[in-house]
């Protein structure tokens, strides 16, 4: 038998995200800065930050140094009954970075699991309040919170990617998709009034993606809407869960979409950029109020969750280094510049046939088409211009690393022009 190529082995045996078995994939041999090196030796700009995570670029020397130092000491140890310095130092830095808006941190392996933990927190805290009937979540349509079961239940049940599981997932309560950015105060007020009518005796918490709905459609909305949702939670004594897995750590131009706008959630999920895209890791932060309610007998007495790799020392050390880079504040100028360059580079596409909308926020650029995108054709058109993108549905979009230069940003815009035009 001939020795099959790596790509052939991949094609034969490895399952990739959101795909059937046997899909052909491009082979990456190296990453460095904003670049991916492909099997043929060509380099392309990773305009996706490898699914929105590699905000400092790939192989940042501070992250690599932190990882190597930690590997030499302790790469993993169980967190049940034990603790370690990397987790303690990271927690201190993470809480400081949030302006000490939270008091407790639960670490997990991925963003989806951090959402599962957040929902557990809210449901247990409701029981601790003496409200065992509060077993549901209220959210809005066009949302996405992950692919594990309870996280799927708060994704859009019809237009999202999990409609297959209708009837199996826990049933939650859904408001319509939120008004988009630039909506009138009247439209926002009317929306909030209709949302308030859905807060019945079964609702424990409202969970939302603030400012940007990610994989549910890359939809932007206004701060006033988030303020209104927070007000509803306070008025009705319900918990507010914010999923900042995509928006956290500067992606929108604010460090956090909620906290930076003076809003105080009860529970917040972060992930993706937490390690600077170095490895999978996430965290769920909560206030002392939530923690104390969970600690009551009615609340269960303890949070019943414990991943094997919870607070992995290697991930904690790399995350600490990533947050140190964030603390320098360089990201603010970088994201502001990228935003201006994406606006200038993508706005001309607004008037092309087939383009429904062009929108930019921070280091996020979105082109919404009138019809579904031919993913392979659009991807190849961008690759022909030296840029890696990953379209879905009707969307061509980019979330480049913050270190992307002006020249590279211009190249990304050129590639998106080609992807829209199909050449």
UniProtKB/Swiss-Prot annotation:
| Localization in the cell | Cytoplasm
Key word Phosphoprotein present in the record? no
Q: Which cofactor does it need?
A: pyridoxal 5'-phosphate
Concerning PROSITE patterns, the annotation shows:
AA_TRANSFER_CLASS_3
* InterPro entries from the UniProt entry: Aminotrans_3 (IPR005814), Aminotrans_3_PPA_site (IPR049704), BioA (IPR005815), PyrdxlP-dep_Trfase (IPR015424), PyrdxlP-dep_Trfase_major (IPR015421), PyrdxlP-dep_Trfase_small (IPR015422)
Secretion signal, residue range per the UniProt entry? none
Chain sites annotated for binding substrate: 51, 144, 272, 306, 390
Q: Which UniProt keywords apply?
A: Aminotransferase, Biotin biosynthesis, Cytoplasm, Pyridoxal phosphate, S-adenosyl-L-methionine, Transferase
Instruction: Cite the EC number.
Output: 2.6.1.62
**What reaction does this catalyse?**
(8S)-8-amino-7-oxononanoate + S-adenosyl-L-methionine = S-adenosyl-4-methylsulfanyl-2-oxobutanoate + (7R,8S)-7,8-diammoniononanoate
NCBIfam families per the UniProt record, alphabetical: bioA, PRK05964.1
Protein name as catalogued: Adenosylmethionine-8-amino-7-oxononanoate aminotransferase
What organism is listed for this UniProt entry?
Corynebacterium glutamicum (strain ATCC 13032 / DSM 20300 / JCM 1318 / BCRC 11384 / CCUG 27702 / LMG 3730 / NBRC 12168 / NCIMB 10025 / NRRL B-2784 / 534)
């Amino acid at each position: 038998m001939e020795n099959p190529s790596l790509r052939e082995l991949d094609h034969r045996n490895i399952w990739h995200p959101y795909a059937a078995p046997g899909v052909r994939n491009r082979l990456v041999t190296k990453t460095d800065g904003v670049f991916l090196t492909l099997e043929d030796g060509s380099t392309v700009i990773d305009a996706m930050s490898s699914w929105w995570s590699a905000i400092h670029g790939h192989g940042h020397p501070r992250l690599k140094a932190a990882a190597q130092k930690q590997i030499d000491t302790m790469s993993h140890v169980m967190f049940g009954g034990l603790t370690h310095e990397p987790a303690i130092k990271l927690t201190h830095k993470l809480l400081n970075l949030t302006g000490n808006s939270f008091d407790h941190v639960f670490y997990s392996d991925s963003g989806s699991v951090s959402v599962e933990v957040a929902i557990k927190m809210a449901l247990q805290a409701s029981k601790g309040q003496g409200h065992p009937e509060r077993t549901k979540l209220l959210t809005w349509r066009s949302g996405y919170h992950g692919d594990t079961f309870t996280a799927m239940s708060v994704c859009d049940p019809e237009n999202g990617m999990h409609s297959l599981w209708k009837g199996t997932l826990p049933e939650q309560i859904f408001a319509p998709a939120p008004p988009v950015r630039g909506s009138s105060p009247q439209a926002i007020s009317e929306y909030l009034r209709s949302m308030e009518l859905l807060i019945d005796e079964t609702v424990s918490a409202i969970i939302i993606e603030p400012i940007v709905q990610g994989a549910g459609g890359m939809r932007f909305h206004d701060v006033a809407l988030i303020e209104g949702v927070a007000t509803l939670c306070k008025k009705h004594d319900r918990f507010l869960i914010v999923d900042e897995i995509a928006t956290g750590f500067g992606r929108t131009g604010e460090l956090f979409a909620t906290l930076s706008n003076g809003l105080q959630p009860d529970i917040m999920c972060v992930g993706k950029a937490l390690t600077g895209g170095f490895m999978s890791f996430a965290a769920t932060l909560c206030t002392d109020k939530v923690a104390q309610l969970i600690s009551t007998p009615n609340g269960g007495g303890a949070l019943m969750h414990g991943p094997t790799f919870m607070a992995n020392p290697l991930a904690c050390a790399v995350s600490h280094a990533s947050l140190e880079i964030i603390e320098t504040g360089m990201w603010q100028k970088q994201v502001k510049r990228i935003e201006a360059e994406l606006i200038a580079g993508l706005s001309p596409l607004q008037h092309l046939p087939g383009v429904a909308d062009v929108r930019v926020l921070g280091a996020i650029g979105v082109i919404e088409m009138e019809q579904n995108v031919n993913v392979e054709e659009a991807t190849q058109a961008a690759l022909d211009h030296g840029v890696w993108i990953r379209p879905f549905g009707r969307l061509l979009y980019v979330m480049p690393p913050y270190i992307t230069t002006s020249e590279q940003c211009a190249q990304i815009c050129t590639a998106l022009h080609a992807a829209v035009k199909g050449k």
